[in-house]
From Swiss-Prot:
SUPFAM superfamilies: ARM repeat (SSF48371). Component of cohesin complex, a complex required for the cohesion of sister chromatids after DNA replication. The cohesin complex apparently forms a large proteinaceous ring within which sister chromatids can be trapped. At anaphase, the complex is cleaved and dissociates from chromatin, allowing sister chromatids to segregate. The cohesin complex may also play a role in spindle pole assembly during mitosis. It comes from Homo sapiens (Human). The gene is STAG2. The modification Phosphothreonine is found at T1112. It is found in: Nucleus; Chromosome; Chromosome, Centromere. GO terms for molecular function: chromatin binding. Residues 1-75, 1064-1083 are annotated as: Disordered. This is Cohesin subunit SA-2. The keyword Nucleus applies. The modification N6-acetyllysine is found at K607. Its main location: nucleus. Interacts directly with RAD21 in cohesin complex. Cohesin complexes are composed of a heterodimer between a SMC1 protein (SMC1A or SMC1B) and SMC3, which are attached via their hinge domain, and RAD21 which link them at their heads, and one STAG protein (STAG1, STAG2 or STAG3). In cohesin complexes, STAG2 is mutually exclusive with STAG1 and STAG3. The modification N-acetylmethionine is found at M1. Coiled coil: none annotated.
């Protein structure tokens, strides 16, 4: 047992215990450590008689007898036979009654009452020991704490403050409440008796220095709460002294005849008593601050550090005259560099309480100037909670004084409105709003009642637009709006103002919006309307849609009504004004999907609906841009809702538009495809533009009645025959035909269909697949990519999955690609996805655009690869085609590593053995490619061969730790690998190694994944291919065989998992080595092996002969899983595990103490935490801030009364940079 550190020898606060937990030499005068101690280092000893041996009380200290006393607690309020700990633990009794009972006990016999209180703190620490009256009288603090340490339960690291469960849920709050109430009830007498507080403070100081975390944590919390209660007492004393001083001054200023001398004497006496009491409180607070806080605020346990910082924040806020100065603020400033987020969070919340009170700002100026940069950098903290509070703190700093934060500081916060983490973004949005939008000029007061362009929000909307454009993140308007939604709702919902800024002419002297600003305003307006209508954050921010409250639903309905009433009238005007601007029109056309369409009828707005439909028709005729046309299509889809009466009106308009487009397309196509005539560019443009419009509408609308398959088929077939069809026409014809197929399938699936419908769709689908296959060999890359993407979609949709969900009637539509099509798809991937990035065009002018194009190209290639991998995962194509994909894993890891890895995982879930065979096939392909390039006499140390080995190692890692689950797959992998290695005999004879023998070097990377018995089985199988001469060879060329054999013969020591690992997550629990396994246990192991009940008819294909006792089923042609462990894993006892038969050698390593998690050990080394900067991005990283700090050990001195000018013992200002931190440590000036 590690002894507790030495504690002061009695209940005297004179000495500061020298901690074994942290070297707090920063706070001590090393050279004059034992010299005379100044004021504040002591609390006076209680006055005791000669017969009282240092403990005071009723002489012998015997507990009183009587019915009203039990365990030092009165039997009142229904609480009987309970100690203080039990009462606080229950948390049901009124705490004041509990404390009053203890005070009565203390007045009767203070030693016995204090003994109860001491045992209360011991029990609250989770210690089962009890301090007896004899120990209390005769033993010193250090001896008592050492004795209690020995009574601790070492098997568990839990104690009341950390225990889980409902009974402990409120323990901490009850514990803290008890201490606060105790001091409050004792504040007028008992705390000044120079005994009770001396005893408690000395005990808590000693416990807080213990190496037992439970003692340290509990006593630190108690001491800090005790200090907080004393600060409150000191504050009350200060108020009383001020009142007494005012009364005294008023009485003394009276005329001599009216002056009451007796009252003056009483007031002087009262002031003197209050002064003495204040001095006593100062001594107590000094003792706690120096004995506990200055040591524990740097404790190794984050919870303890957090307690200290939280409480010092309360002291500074509660009694700012005494504590809000740089001598105490420095502790918070230093701790902002703490390595644990919860401690940094406490620092920020403590500072928020101070900055919130504007009256305290003058006292924070020096602190702000020193630590402002740190606070700004914490907005990028890796802990999001810390970042949020840092931004909120800066918002308070901004409100207190705008001059403190520079433009650069503000910009560091501004960009966080685009953060994907919503709480961070919302906090940054509030900061932005306070900085740029909350101020209003006096001249704007007269504009409050105005609306629209002349309203008070007009300038603010412009400011928002300017900010959005300057941020240069034009694709993230939704994020900006969401960030400011909570704090600037009124501004963001002023759609009337936004609309007037777009439609109305600027006033005289007002600068009009530029084209770029109008585009930005329209985008922001769209995002605000979407946010109001949908009531959830944009994609990528938040956890998805939540259930709206009744109030939120009402607000949503009101907003949609307001949006519809305004924009049903304004939208046609906006479309007319910006009809030629594709970007603006695209955004404006999205508004109707957020309308309440019923208002068109109830509000008699049909004429505005007609105007909207006319504008959409005009836009379709004017534009050929795909985004604009799709926006028009979606708008028609939103308006064509059969639930509303406007459906007929919109449907007629849509049908008329499609009729005209279809007729025009057929007419143009007939002219375009006339034989013998060369189509000119104008004809091609007309065909393309019309086809674009039809394709865009076919995306959202069923146009089956216009029979678009025939004309598109004719167009595509002509393109194949002639080979001169413009690429854009082919691309859109393929896409349009794809939509035709999908709409027909949807119609067949949703309603009963005839056999003729199925056969017609089957024929069209097969013909279309053949056309797409033809276009895979087109000379144009864009056409090939479109054909490949559509072909993958068609194969996926019409695979065997189409019959799932009870749709067996669709079986005739199932289409399985033949080997030639699979081969062409794979060739396309190899030729167009696994290619090197073109780095030629890197001019300075076009570098940024070039980077953007590269990213876009990579994104396109990733989509192509994902489409093909989906075919592999859903077994639409053969799994072995994945070998050509898997072998690219290392080479293209940065670009496609995640896709390939996920494909491996999914294929392994489908078929472990086939996946393993595919992996080994990919390695064999790479090996063969290396042989073709370098010949059989290649260098095994070459980068190419090393790369293949590294790929094998990566493949091995993907099998995970559960060897039992992958047992068969790994065995089959070794089988295929061995056969490949010996497949090509050396033409020079058996004295030379087989041509592929070096492949065994690659195969050895998988040996660690074999179970012990399977290693023996694989070794036996390997020997079937070896001759006697091979086993004797030791030349370098035979090294792969030797290393592979050794990896199989390594046996148990190389095994990292036992068979039982697949059954129990507990793993091996062997604590001691066993000499020899019992026979019974050996039988269990043999029973765990996968046995064979059938033999292969061909002996050549068998791994083992019948005489061999170890069997690995995957090495047979017909594997059968007959093992008990595979069927009923729970029947195995832990003592019968594989590990108990083959005990692993245990290596003892010295494990460093991990402060990031609470362990279960009783004793701890009290290392000082490394204070580190944990920012994502920070400058001027401070290394080990605590090291070399020269802490001052100032006394707590309460400020003099504002009217007590005669007091001369005023303390100097302790804020001395030299006493705070040695500047040589940081290399920068502290302030």
């Amino acid at each position: 047992m590690i002894a507790a550190p030495e504690i002061p020898t009695d209940f005297n606060l004179l000495q500061e215990s020298e901690t074994h937990f942290s070297s707090d030499t920063d706070f001590e005068d090393i050279e004059g450590k034992n010299q005379k101690q100044g004021k504040g280092k002591t609390c006076k000893k209680g006055k005791k008689g000669p017969a009282e041996k240092g403990k005071g009380g009723n002489g012998g200290g015997k507990p009183p007898s009587g019915p009203n006393r039990m365990n030092g607690h009165h039997q009142q309020n229904g609480v009987e036979n309970m100690m203080l700990f039990e009462v606080v633990k229950m948390g049901k009794s009124a705490m004041q009654s509990v404390v009053d009972d203890w005070i009565e006990s203390y007045k009767h016999d203070r030693d016995i009452a204090l003994l109860d209180l001491i045992n209360f703190f011991i029990q609250c620490s989770g210690c089962k020991g009890v301090v007896t009256a004899e120990m209390f009288r005769h033993m010193q603090n250090s001896e008592i704490i050492r004795k209690m340490t020995e009574e601790f339960d070492e098997d568990s690291g839990d104690y009341p403050l950390t225990m889980a469960g409902p009974q402990w849920k409120k323990f901490k709050s009850s514990f803290c409440e008890f201490i606060g109430v105790l001091v409050r009830q004792c504040q007028y007498s008992i705390i000044y008796d120079e005994y009770m507080m001396d005893t408690v403070i000395s005990l808590l100081t000693g416990l807080s220095d213990s190496q037992v975390r439970a003692f340290r944590h509990t006593s630190t919390l108690a001491a800090m709460k005790l200090m907080t209660a004393l600060v409150n007492v000191a504050l009350n004393l200060s108020i009383n002294m001020d009142n007494t001083q005012r009364q005294y001054e008023a009485e003394r200023n009276k005329m001599i005849g009216k002056r009451a001398n007796e009252r003056l004497e009483l007031l002087l006496q009262k002031r003197k008593e209050l002064q003495e009491n204040q001095d006593e409180i100062e001594n107590m607070m000094n003792a706690i601050f120096k004995g506990v806080f200055v040591h524990r605020y740097r404790d190794a346990i984050a919870e303890i550090r957090a307690i200290c910082i939280e409480e010092i924040g309360i002291w500074m806020k509660m009694y700012s005259d005494a504590f809000l100065n740089d001598s105490y603020l420095k502790y918070v400033g230093w701790t902002m560099h703490d390595k644990q987020g919860e401690v940094r969070l406490k620092c920020l919340t403590a500072l928020q309480g101070l900055y919130y009170n504007k009256e305290l700002n003058s006292k924070l100026e020096l602190f702000t100037s020193r630590f402002k940069d740190r606070i700004v950098s914490m907005t990028l903290d890796k802990e999001y909670d810390v970042a949020v509070q840092a931004i909120k703190l800066l918002t308070l700093v901004l409100q207190s004084s705008e001059e403190v934060l520079t433009a650069e500081d503000c910009e560091n916060v501004y960009h966080l409105v685009y953060s994907a983490h919503r709480p961070v973004a919302v906090a940054a949005g509030e900061f932005l709003y306070k900085k740029l939008f909350s101020r209003r000029d006096p001249e704007e007061d007269g504009m409050m009642k105005r609306r629209g362009r002349q309203g008070p929000n007009a300038n603010l909307v412009k400011t928002l637009v300017f900010f959005f454009l300057e941020s240069e993140l034009h694709e993230h308007a939704a994020y900006l709006v969401d960030s400011m939604w909570d704090c600037a709702t009124e501004l963001l919902k002023d759609w009337e103002c936004m609309n007037s800024l777009l439609l109305e002419e600027p006033l005289s002297g007002e600068e009009a919006l530029t084209d770029r600003q109008e585009s930005a305003l329209i985008e922001i307006m769209l995002c605000t309307i979407r946010q109001a209508a949908e009531c959830h954050p944009p994609v990528g921010r938040g956890t998805g849609k939540r259930v709206l409250t009744a109030k939120e639903k009402k607000t949503q309905l009101d907003d949609r009504t307001k949006i519809t009433e305004l924009f049903a009238v304004a939208l046609p005007q906006l479309l007319a004004k910006y009809s030629v601007d594709a970007e603006k029109v695209t955004n404006l056309l999205q508004l109707p999907q957020y309308f309440d369409l019923e208002i068109y009828t109830t509000g008699r707005l049909e004429k505005h609906l007609d105007a909207l439909l006319r504008q959409i028709r005009n836009i379709v005729e004017k534009h050929t841009d795909t985004d604009v046309l799709e926006a028009c299509s979606k708008t028609y889809h939103a308006l064509c809702n059969e639930e509303f009466t406007i459906f007929n009106r919109v449907d007629i308009s849509r049908s008329q538009l499609i009729d005209e487009l279809a007729d025009k397309f057929n007419r143009l196509l007939e002219d375009f495809l006339q034989e013998g005539e060369e189509p000119d560019e104008d004809d091609a443009y007309q065909v393309l533009s019309t086809l674009k419009r039809i394709t865009a509408f076919h995306n959202a609308h069923d146009l089956s009645k216009w029979d678009l398959f025939a004309c598109n088929y004719k167009l595509l077939k002509t393109g194949i025959e002639n080979g001169d069809m413009p690429e854009q026409i082919v691309i859109h014809a393929l896409q349009c035909t794809h939509y035709v197929i999908l709409w027909q399938l949807a119609k067949i699936t949703e309603s009963s269909s005839t056999k003729e419908d199925l056969l017609r769709l089957k024929k069209q689908m097969r013909v279309f697949c053949q056309i797409c296959q033809h276009y895979l060999t087109n000379v144009n890359t864009t056409v090939k990519e479109q054909a490949f993407t559509i072909l993958c979609d068609i194969l996926m949709i019409f695979s065997h999955q189409i019959m799932s969900g009870g749709r067996d009637m669709l079986e005739p539509l199932v289409y399985t690609p033949d080997s030639s099509l699979q081969s062409e798809l794979l060739s396309f991937i190899l030729d167009h996805v696994f290619i090197e990035q073109d780095d030629d065009n890197n001019s300075a002018d076009g570098q940024q655009e070039d980077e953007a194009s590269k990213i876009e190209a990579l994104h396109k290639r990733r989509n192509l690869l994902a489409a093909f991998c989906k075919l592999i995962v859903y077994t639409v194509v053969e799994m072995n085609t994945a070998a050509d994909i898997f072998k690219q894993y290392m080479k293209y890891y940065n670009d496609y590593g995640d896709i390939i890895k996920e494909t491996m995982s999914k294929t392994r879930q489908i078929d472990k053995i086939q996946c393993a065979k595919t992996l080994i096939l990919s390695l064999q392909q790479l090996f063969n490619e290396m042989i073709q390039e370098n010949g059989y006499n290649f260098d095994r140390s070459s980068s190419t061969f090393s790369g293949i080995k590294e790929l094998a190692r990566r493949f091995a890692l993907t099998f995970g730790l559960d060897q039992l689950k992958t047992r068969e797959a790994i065995a089959m992998l070794h089988k295929d690998g061995i056969e490949f290695a010996f497949k090509e005999p050396n033409p020079q004879g058996e004295s030379h190694p087989p041509l592929n023998l070096a492949f065994l070097d690659i195969l050895s990377e998988f040996s660690s994944k074999l179970l012990r018995q399977d290693k023996r089985t694989v070794y036996v199988y390997l020997e079937k291919f070896m001759t006697f001469q091979m086993s004797l060879r030791r030349e370098d060329v035979w090294l792969p065989l030797m290393s592979y054999r050794n990896s199989l013969l390594a046996g148990g020591d190389d095994d990292t998992m036992s068979v039982i690992s697949g059954i129990s997550s507990r793993g091996s629990t062997v604590r001691s080595k066993k000499s020899k396994p019992s026979t019974g246990k050996r039988k269990v192991v043999e029973g765990m092996q996968l046995s064979l009940t059938e033999e292969s008819s061909s002996s050549d294909s068998m791994w083992l002969s019948r005489e061999q006792t170890l069997h690995t089923p995957v090495m047979m042609q017909t594997p059968q899983l007959t093992s008990t462990i595979m069927r009923e894993p729970k029947r195995l006892r832990p003592e019968d595990s594989f590990m108990s038969v083959y005990p692993m050698q245990t290596e003892h390593h010295q494990t460093p103490l991990d402060y990031n998690r609470r362990g279960t050990s009783l004793m701890e080394d009290d290392e000082e935490p490394i204070v580190e900067d944990v920012m994502m991005s920070s400058e001027g990283r401070i290394e080990d801030l605590n090291e070399g700090m020269d802490f001052d050990t100032m006394d707590i001195d309460l400020p003099p009364s504002k009217n007590r000018r005669e007091r001369t013992e005023l303390k100097p200002d302790f804020f001395d940079p030299a006493s705070i931190m040695d500047e040589s440590v940081l290399g920068v000036s502290m302030f």
